[in-house]
Amino acid sequence: MATIHKLFKSPFFDFEFLRLLAMAPYEGAEIGEVLEAAAKIKDQDPESWYSTLLETGGKAEAIAKQAEASGDRVGARRAYLRSSNYLRAAQFMLNEGPIGHDERVLPTLERAIANFRKGVQYRDGKTIFLEIPYEGGKTLPGYLYLPPAARRIPGRKIPILLNSGGGDSTQEEIYFVNPAYGPDLGYAVLTFEGPGQGIVLRRDKLPMRPDWESVTGPVLDHLFDLATRHPELELDLDHIAVTGASMGGYFALRAAADPRIKACVSVDGFYSLSSFVGGRMPGPLFNGFMSGWLSDWMFNGILGVLKKLAFQARWEFNHLRWATGSTTDADVMRSFGAYTLQKADGTEYLADVKCPTLVTGAGASFYFDPATTTDKIYDCLTSLQDGVDKEKWIATDVAYGGLQAKIGAFGYSAQKTFEWLDQRFGIQREPLAASSRLEDLVSRL
């Protein structure tokens, strides 16, 4: 297995910084800006992480405004998008205390979103901002990215990829994976933020829910309503796929049982959240609590000591408190049991998935072991035939998708995703043959 250069000694800071850097190919970062920031950030110091990336985001924002003033659409788009990404990353490490305790988080994220919304308006294709009706009179924010007219697939309506976020992503971050890729192939990509994610968590304080089909159901309802009210969009409601990475891979599988979904790509998802946490926590601590041997106060006390010693553990449990709406770490642990693909009666939820499904794994992940995640998910898709309508791809090298959520290999992951969807949706493309001959170039005009 190939190794890569480390920018930070701690695996957590290194992984999260690589996550930011990985978006450079799709205008989510500028290499010089990012490397300059890396030199200023102190390892495992969330304050230096925040202040440095806030400064970097502000500089990119100023560049975007300068490009706007001079009428440079490309420059404005690029600078606004990477400014948004830097600001999104800046607030990422600030999660001490309950939601709202750190008053820098929400305004920083809102600024990131505002810059993102400016940037995507300078895309070649249209971006439709969505307000998706949800339970209790709430709405969920979403984006529908349409392909440019010149990129439409000849002779057919526009196929759609529904891209769910994960456990700690924002939908603006998700843009740099599939929405930045799919429209150039003629696909529309729809992203949204559900409870426990992004601005819906930090502003509206809606906790996450394990039955994600109750979230994607209203999203699909809204998509169908939009397509009906605006037939001029030519959205192909008979060819809708769903995808997501990491926890988003779990969410995608929950959504895939909906008959309106015709294909699913679950990228590095998990079968159960408890098994994931069990692999990340000292065995005696995890097993002691889950068996009832350790009381809440004992578990909270022991974990409190571990969190003081390890920033990653502190960050992860702080975030999980936010996302699950829990007040203690013991409450967080109890909430995990509901996040599983096994039904309460012991049967498999995945048996209800009838659409073709691609399941991926990450062999170099420090979060999941493909043997207990990817393989188990694949085997539980019992309504699908091996190698016919279910497939498995486990990457090992970091450069080609070996890290969790395909961090560092977004381009290759997107290529594999849309190539597989083309096959499932019957989309045939002519092989390409690059040529610099003047006659060939003129004939294409």
Swiss-Prot record:
Alphabetically list the UniProt keywords: Hydrolase
Enumerate the active-site residues: 246
MF terms from GO for this chain are: hydrolase activity
Expression triggers: Expression is induced under hypoxic conditions.
- Cite the InterPro entries for this sequence: AB_hydrolase_1, AB_hydrolase_fold, FrsA_esterase
Pathway(s) where this gene product acts: Secondary metabolite biosynthesis
State which Enzyme Commission number(s) the record gives. Answer: 3.7.1.-
Lineage top rank: taxon: Eukaryota
Name the top EC class: hydrolase
**Any one GO BP annotation for this protein:** melanin biosynthetic process
Explain the consequences of disrupting this gene.
Answer: Results in significant reduction of pseurotin production.
Q: What does this protein do?
A: Alpha/beta hydrolase; part of the gene cluster that mediates the biosynthesis of pseurotin A, a competitive inhibitor of chitin synthase and an inducer of nerve-cell proliferation. The PKS-NRPS hybrid synthetase psoA is responsible for the biosynthesis of azaspirene, one of the first intermediates having the 1-oxa-7-azaspiro[4,4]-non-2-ene-4,6-dione core of pseurotin, via condensation of one acetyl-CoA, 4 malonyl-CoA, and a L-phenylalanine molecule. The dual-functional monooxygenase/methyltransferase psoF seems to be involved in the addition of the C3 methyl group onto the pseurotin scaffold.
Quaternary structure, from the entry: Homodimer.
Q: Identify its protein family.
A: Belongs to the AB hydrolase superfamily. FUS2 hydrolase family.
Listed name of the protein: Alpha/beta hydrolase psoB
